[in-house]
């Protein structure tokens, strides 16, 4: 796992995003998919909204996924394994990139076939505690012609990476292959989810510079 951590840190430092495969093994992905939460997820999860707290609204013309937040204190063992791995990654990022990440939040996500999420930024204007976005995909045997890619709109040259360097504006597509993890700057990288021809599953989260329970105090 240390090799994965090193690759993630190098990517974040150099270009503001990183992608690694096999962050979760196929066996670990299957164990998550077999949880009751992911069986008939569209029926059990809540329709995701846009905005935060009191300003939140449902708008399927912008966002079409369903989510269920993970309770870190009560999560099932397959999810706990993933969360512990995230905690180790946070510690590694803090040590190597001199960040001050203090907590994280994660929800289970399902996009029904044909649904999407239009271009957006993860960090809210009124709440800048989301520093890094992190997504782990749970889709076995995914084929590129099924679509569903995450499209990142990479920052213009005047927006620095964690090492203070910029890059040309361009897009980067990431297909939602099982076990693949993508991590990127929540404050800089706008992104969108393109429609897929089949259901698309992931664990979607954010690394924070504030404890979750203190964010709204």
Question: Predicted segments — roles?
Answer:
Residues 3-92:
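Non-heme Fe(II)/2-oxoglutarate
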Residues 19, 107, 133, 202:
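Amphipathic alpha-helical recognition patches that constitute DNA-binding helices
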Residues 35, 39-41, 96, 141, ...:
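Phosphate/oxyanion-binding loops and surfaces in catalytic or ligand/nucleic-acid-binding neighborhoods
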Residues 99-107:
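A short coil-to-beta-strand element that immediately follows conserved catalytic motifs
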Residues 108-125:
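Conserved short histidine dyad/triad with adjacent acidic residue
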Residues 125, 130, 139-162, 167-217:
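Catalytic core of Fe(II)/2-oxoglutarate
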């Amino acid at each position: 796992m240390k090799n994965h951590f090193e690759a993630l840190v190098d990517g974040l430092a150099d270009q503001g995003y990183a992608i690694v495969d096999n962050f979760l093994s196929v066996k670990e992905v299957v164990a998550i998919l077999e949880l009751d939460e992911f069986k008939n997820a569209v029926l059990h999860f809540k329709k995701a909204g846009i905005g935060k707290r009191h300003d939140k609204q449902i708008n399927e013309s912008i966002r079409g996924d369903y989510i269920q937040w993970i309770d870190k204190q009560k999560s099932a063992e397959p999810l706990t394994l993933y969360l512990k791995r995230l905690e180790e990654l946070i510690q590694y990022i803090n040590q190597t990139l001199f960040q001050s990440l203090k907590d994280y939040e994660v929800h289970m996500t399902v996009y029904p076939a044909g649904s999407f999420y239009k271009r957006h930024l993860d960090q809210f204007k009124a709440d800048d505690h989301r520093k890094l976005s992190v997504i782990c995909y749970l889709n076995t045997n995914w084929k590129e012609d099924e679509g569903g890619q995450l499209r990142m709109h990479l920052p213009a040259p005047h927006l620095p990476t964690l090492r203070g360097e910029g890059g040309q504006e361009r897009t980067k597509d990431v297909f939602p292959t099982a076990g693949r993890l993508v991590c990127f700057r929540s404050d800089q990288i706008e992104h969108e989810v393109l429609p897929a021809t089949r259901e698309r599953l992931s664990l979607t989260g954010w690394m924070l510079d504030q404890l979750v329970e203190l964010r709204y105090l």
